[in-house]
Each structure stands twice: as structure tokens, then as C-alpha cells.
């Protein structure tokens, strides 16, 4: 049964490209995280049309100054990028010290930050 009043996107509709940034500058400066391995991991694992590593012209990944920029010409989920980044941290045993959070400043930016352990240390000192 067809939906009444639903408009289909015609041939004239353009796919909107999206751009996401993963900011890893603090862990990279401390040499805990290697940005080249994260870039390679994303290139190998991002799936386009069901195939991993076949980015083609639809997805491009670049790195600069501790940040990775992912540009997609087609639909691309921000959540999928977070999932892959967390998977990378788990693979290289960094998940215990680092976490991936969305930036408050910009909608399309993820930040890789350290867990805040100074609050826990203060609570242990009080006991």
C-alpha cells in the first residue's frame, strides 16, 4: 500500500555531502595515540555499499595536526564514525584511558579525550 502524500526524491535531487572531524590532538601530542594508524584503520574499515575498504570517490579521509577529516559525498552516519573510533581504541588497548565524545562547540566534531580521573583521586584521598 502506497503512502498518500509522500514525495519521492526525483532525479534532480542532489545527495548532500557531509564532513566530520575527529580531534585527537591531545593524545597525539602525548604520543599515546598514533594518528597514522587511526587513519589507516578507518580507511580499511569504513564500508561503502557493503564493502569495507572500497572508499572510491565517495569517502575521503585526510589528517592534519592531530585531526582526521572524513568527507563523504553520500549519506554517512556520525554514529558509525564514533563506533569505528571506539573499535580502534579497543584494538590498541587505549579504551581504558581514552574516550570519544561529541564536541560541545561544533556539531560535526568528535574529540578523543582522557578519562577524568582527578575526581576519583580526590575521593580516595578523603577516605
Swiss-Prot record:
InterPro entries: Ribosomal_eL22, Ribosomal_eL22_sf
Any GO BP annotation: translation
Swiss-Prot/TrEMBL keywords: Ribonucleoprotein, Ribosomal protein
Span of the signal peptide: none
GO CC annotations on file: cytosolic large ribosomal subunit
Pfam families: Ribosomal_L22e (PF01776)
GO molecular function: structural constituent of ribosome
Superkingdom classification of source: Eukaryota
Family (UniProt): Belongs to the eukaryotic ribosomal protein eL22 family.
Name of the protein described by the UniProt record: Large ribosomal subunit protein eL22x
Organism: Arabidopsis thaliana
Amino acid at each position: 500500500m502506497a503512502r498518500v502524500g509522500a514525495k519521492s526524491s526525483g532525479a534532480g535531487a542532489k545527495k548532500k555531502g557531509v564532513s566530520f572531524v575527529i580531534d585527537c590532538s591531545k593524545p597525539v601530542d602525548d604520543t599515546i595515540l598514533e594518528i597514522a594508524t587511526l587513519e589507516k584503520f578507518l580507511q580499511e574499515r569504513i564500508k561503502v555499499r557493503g564493502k569495507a575498504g572500497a572508499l572510491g570517490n565517495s569517502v575521503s579521509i585526510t589528517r592534519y595536526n592531530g585531526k582526521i577529516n572524513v568527507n563523504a559525498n553520500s549519506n554517512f552516519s556520525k554514529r558509525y564514525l564514533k563506533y569505528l573510533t571506539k573499535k580502534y581504541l579497543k584494538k590498541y588497548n587505549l579504551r581504558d584511558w581514552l574516550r570519544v565524545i561529541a564536541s560541545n562547540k561544533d556539531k560535526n566534531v568528535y574529540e578523543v579525550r582522557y578519562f577524568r580521573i582527578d575526581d576519583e583521586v580526590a575521593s580516595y584521598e578523603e577516605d
